[in-house]
Amino acid sequence: MNEILNKQDDKALWEYENFVKTHINGNFMQSLCWTGVKRTWEWEAIVSRDDTGKIKGTALILIKKIPFLGCSFLYSPHGPVCDYTDVKTLRDIFEGIEKLKELHNGYELRVDPCITENDTKEINIMKSLGFEFQENAPELTTIQARNNYILRINNRSKEEIFESFHKKWRYNIRLSLRKGVECRVCGPECLDDFYKLMEETGKRDGFCIRSKEYFELMLKNLGEHCRLYMCYHDNEPLSGAITTQYAGKTCYVYGASTAKSRNVMPNYLMQWNMICWAVENGCSIYDFQGIPFYKDENHPNYGVYRFKQGFNGEVLTYA
């Protein structure tokens, strides 16, 4: 049976959050903390329980009102959270979401669950429930990146993981340390430094960036699940990243760097420090996130893939 989460019930909120953060398919964007970041959206959540009252699945739904049209767009980022082979639970969750669509006059529901393109059983189940699989969607047309680069930790030690990197990547990490680059875990006091790097990166690489307030909200609302990493050389900021750790996964969500002093290799050291955070807390995956156009060696973004590839992970393509 499904229910709309009661936002006034502290026990229900705790129970929801505990389910999501301990589930293998949990994701920080399905956390209630994420609603404090997406402040321009309304939100609801659906909870599906078995006959004993145990939670079997959940879905956080972001709701965007469309001005002047009186309708809404509903989106569940990397949701729902459940066993994707459990048809009964999936159907129950989506029946609950249909109630939300009626309440908010929804014209479209979009979900991007953590199902890979090779999970044909799960894909067919989603199709049977009325969803369309955008198999050939062009790069950058989906809300979340379809092609990610991940490093599976697999209970390995830091030493074992380090030795698995390409030898040039190991050299660059050691070089960065020898050159005196310092990678720090920072608080909001370093956001100005990070945002200047982000502005430079966006201008250099030709993409729009989030507001500084957005990054402030991430650090504030995700709390212990979010870190700001900064690399400094002689107290000059060279690179920075906002990284999350939730449900057994550490995700490199936003990164920025200056074109100056690249010879001291700050980005290599920063990634290594974030991977160490994942290992220290028993994560199963370190997610480098998107690698758009990674199959096209002539595309300007190909260098993003080449950099991440040196850490000896694998490409994961979501459905």
Regions found by a protein language model. Give the residues of each.
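A gly/proline- and charged-residue-enriched helix-loop-helix capping module
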Residues: P80-Q134
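Hydrophobic faces of well-ordered beta-strands that scaffold small-molecule active sites
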Residues: L74-S76, L109, Y286
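A short, internal acetyl-CoA/4′-phosphopantetheine-binding micro-motif in the GNAT/acyltransferase core
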Residues: P77-V87, N154-R156, G255-V264, P292
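N-terminal cap/recognition module
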Residues: I66-P67, C71-P80
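Aromatic (often tryptophan-rich) hydrophobic motifs at membrane interfaces
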Residues: R91-E102, E216-A319
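Short glycine-/small-residue-rich flexible loop motifs, especially phosphate/cofactor-binding loops
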Residues: E17, E98, I123, I173, ...
